[in-house]
Every structure is written in structure tokens, then in C-alpha cells.
Amino acid sequence: MKRPVLIGITGGTGSGKSTVAKEIYNKFDEACIAMIEQDSYYKDQSSIPFEERCKKNYDHPDAFDNELLIDHLKNLVDLNVIEKPIYDFEAHNRKEETIKVEPRDIIILEGILVLQDPKVRELLDIKIYVDTDADVRIIRRLLRDINERGRTVDSVINQYLTVVRPMHMQFIEPSKRYADIIIPEGGHNRVAVDMMVANIKHLLQK
């Protein structure tokens, strides 16, 4: 097995980056592709009371355990199996269980700050930024956090205005300049997704 092709997919909350990642994932046989979500690498907070965990800024680079993420990416590149953490968004903490991820020909890393850390960027073969209007992103974030993460409307809006938007402007939007490809309209941009798939297949044939 050759060195895997590492693809980083980033963009603001609700931009459609997960949709793009899944669209690319579904174009390949499951035996040759793996997905790594940056959300899985939020820091372990077992020593912090729940009330304090609720107040944390989860859109700041310091919220992520990039040391572990980088170690896992390097292990996958070296064709080693990893134990990916599982993050509980309602408890704001990692679960005790992990998910075994085996090395594959293609590794997709998806998350809001994938291109922010230079040590992560240098491991990536393809860097993608998914660009979507802010009003579309906030509506998607609202629906997701209420339906999937047990949040209230007021808490989501307050978090967006005080944390999510400022962090987007400070860290996520500036990381766009590191992207090889910028995809507008998120996962609905079929032409861009098909172009990415063709590019990945080309890299695999080298």
C-alpha cells in the first residue's frame, strides 16, 4: 500500500463542508477511504466540571487536541491503525470508547480549523475551503444544534453572536488563503465535487 492521500476540508460552521466530505467519500469504495472529523479531537475535559465545560469556547484553536490529531494522521500515513476519540456534544467531553480507523488509500480530514495549524496543513495533499454565505450557515447551525445536539434556540443564537462569528472572522475565514481549492455553495456544487474526485483519482495513480 502506498502513502495515503490526505485531504483537508474546512469552512465555517454550516458551510456544507461535511456534505462535501461525504459526497467525496461516497464516490469511492469504503475499503479505500476513511473519514476523520476534527470534532473528534476536542480536548479531554474529564477534570473540568460540566458547568465550566458549557462555557468553553469550542471554536477557538485551543479547544482542539492537535497534538493527538497530528500523531494520528502521521500514524495513518505510516500505515498504522489508530483509535479515534468519540466526542459527546451534550456532555462536552470525550467518551471512554474509541473507534478503530485503519489506514486507507484516501484519508479525509474535515473540520472548522483544519487549515489553521501549519503542522496539520503540511501533512495535507489537497486543501479545500467550502465557502457559503453567513446567513445560510447560521440557519444550518441553528437547525443542527437544536435537532442533533439538544440545544435551545436562544443558546445557539447567543453562542453564534458571541463566539462563533468572532472566531470565524479571526481564525476560519483567514485560513481560506491556504486552500488549494475554494468551493462555493457547499455540497450542492456537483461540478466542484466531481473535479475533486477526478483529481484524487489522478493522485492515486501516480
Curated annotation (Swiss-Prot):
Catalytic reaction equation(s): uridine + ATP = UMP + ADP + H(+); cytidine + ATP = CMP + ADP + H(+)
EC number: 2.7.1.48
Domain of life: Bacteria
Chain positions recorded as ATP binding sites: G11, G12, T13, G14, S15, G16, K17, S18
The protein, known as: Uridine kinase
Annotated pathway: Pyrimidine metabolism; CTP biosynthesis via salvage pathway; CTP from cytidine: step 1/3; Pyrimidine metabolism; UMP biosynthesis via salvage pathway; UMP from uridine: step 1/1
Gene name, Swiss-Prot/TrEMBL: udk
Top enzyme class: transferase
Keywords, in A-Z order: ATP-binding, Cytoplasm, Kinase, Nucleotide-binding, Transferase
Keyword Metal-binding: no
An annotated Gene Ontology molecular function: ATP binding
GO annotation, cellular component aspect: cytoplasm
SUPFAM superfamilies from the UniProt entry: P-loop containing nucleoside triphosphate hydrolases
InterPro entries for this protein: P-loop_NTPase, PRK/URK, Uridine_kinase, Uridine_kinase-like
An example Gene Ontology biological process: CTP salvage
CDD domains named in the record: UMPK
Similarity comment text for this entry: Belongs to the uridine kinase family.
Protein's cellular compartments: Cytoplasm
